[in-house]
Amino acid sequence: MLNLILMILLNLVVGGCIGLTGIAGFLLPMFYAGFLDMPSSASLALSFAAFLISGILGSVNYYKSGNLDLKTASVLSAGSFVGALAGVKINLLIPADTMKIILYLVVLLSGISILLRKDKPGNTEKKAVQSVPFFLVLGAVTGAVCAASGAGGPVLVMPILTLLGIPAHTAVGISLFDSIFIAVPSAAGYLIAAAGNKEVFLLLPVLLVAHGIGVFVGSKNATKINQTLLKRIVAVASIAIACIKLFL
């Protein structure tokens, strides 16, 4: 019962953080596997199912607030869907520790780049939608890495989009939309792999409701945060997360 309460609370908090900044989803598989000793397939199945909910609810709220560039998001997501399909397969071939090291190195560099980068007048989404092939490749690579490592997507995608010149709130909206197309093939693949684990399917509806509530509340309040402050929060959080995972 204690484990269930902790899982519900974690999904509420992580959902809220995802709604606000786009990041924190990686905490779910880390908690499930690291603290509860869940099998890898079960922890990833529960995590990516939650990421699907956060992606849908978060995207809707960010779209309503005018912070979702569908053109960029659609191109990126097309690449991510294909990449995620490959990522689930890669997870079975490459040691998970290796994939996590790759992920957090990229997160670390992205966070540092955001802190060092200075905003320029007129820096808008126009810079980011110029190259369709670039965003297809970016989506494929990030989708594969995230699906294989257990990260939902925004923790890697959001800092990169911000680095490319996309406003912070819009970058969160795009990364949440993109996470839907990482989560669909990933959740399906890992749920199939965990088909023999009845506990997963009993926990799923309760945890998804808790996660959804957190995301809804967080994304509703995201625009109340100053954009410059949001960038710094994401950058510092990304650096801290990466350093903890890489060096501790």
Task: Please tell me what each predicted stretch does.
Residues 173-175, 185-189:
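Feature detects amphipathic, helix-rich regulatory segments
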Residues 59-60, 187:
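Generic hydrophobic alpha-helical segments
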Residues 54-56:
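Central hydrophobic cores of alpha-helical transmembrane segments in multi-pass inner-membrane proteins
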Residues 154-155:
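Extracytoplasmic gate region of multi-pass secondary transporters
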Residues 130, 180-184:
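Accessory recognition modules or surfaces
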Residues 1-40, 60-148, 158-164, 168-170, ...:
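Juxtamembrane transmembrane-helix boundary motif
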Residues 44-52, 172-180, 238:
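Transmembrane helix-bundle signature of multi-pass membrane transporters/permeases
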